[in-house]
A protein has these predicted regions:
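Residue microenvironments linked to proteolytic maturation
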Residues: 4-9, 14-20, 38, 54-155
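Short Gly/aromatic-enriched secondary-structure transition segments
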Residues: 20-32
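Short, surface-exposed beta-strand-loop junctions and turns on beta-sheet-rich folds
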Residues: 24-25, 46, 72-74
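Short conserved beta-strand and strand-loop elements enriched in small hydrophobics
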Residues: 35-46, 91
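C-terminal (or distal) subdomains of carbohydrate-active enzymes
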Residues: 47-51
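Intrinsically disordered, compositionally biased, charge-dense segments
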Residues: 143-181
Length: 181
């Protein structure tokens, strides 16, 4: 896929119980594959000022993935900074036309918007890629996953050193930090 977007992540994941007790099932939103929906702040889709950009949806085996682009409004720019800084890492969807079983398994629906939220209802809905473009003409990329430690250093530098556990002498051990991989 060759398209420009500011970040991407899971709009919703299958087979996880959401905060409302519903469980999205495989291909529940397959009709939304390839559709573009508004990207909004915290499901507040009743005012134009809450529209932060748009999300291109991709139905996958594990759920619906979203490629999101911010608009140039003040709200869009502010939200972009929140995402780039890792202050917001969760996504959520608003959908209607739901078909569900008596046990609250969602088997069909239509996604109407993707929201940036402080805490999502679906535990698997989060941002996992942020395009950190710098104005110097070069693209910088990173993958951010919620609740994982981040270590940053330049490619021409050695990774930061860590203090040896229990040494107490404050000397650094000549061993790079574990970057969580």
């Amino acid at each position: 896929m060759n398209l420009k977007y500011d970040f991407s992540g899971w709009a919703t994941r299958n087979d996880l119980v959401c905060a409302d007790g519903r469980t999205i099932r495989h291909n529940a939103f397959e009709d939304c594959d390839g559709k573009t929906v508004p990207l909004v702040w915290n499901h507040q889709h009743d005012e134009p000022g809450n529209i932060l950009g748009h999300a291109l949806l991709e139905n996958r085996k594990d759920g619906v993935y979203a490629y999101c682009t911010f608009n140039e409004t003040d709200a869009g720019k502010a939200a972009k900074m929140l995402v780039q800084h890792g202050d917001i890492a969760s996504l959520s969807i608003y959908a209607n036309g739901l078909k569900q079983t008596p046990s609250k398994d969602v088997t069909h629906g239509v996604i109407r918007e993707v929201s940036l939220v402080v805490a999502g209802a679906n535990p698997g809905a989060f941002i996992d890629f942020v395009d950190m473009a710098h104005g110097e003409g070069g693209e910088q990329e990173m993958i951010l996953s919620a609740y994982e430690p981040i270590s940053l250093f330049r490619p021409d530098e050695k990774p930061p050193l860590v203090h040896k556990a229990g040494s107490g002498d404050g000397k650094k051990e000549d061993k790079p930090k574990d970057d969580g991989k």
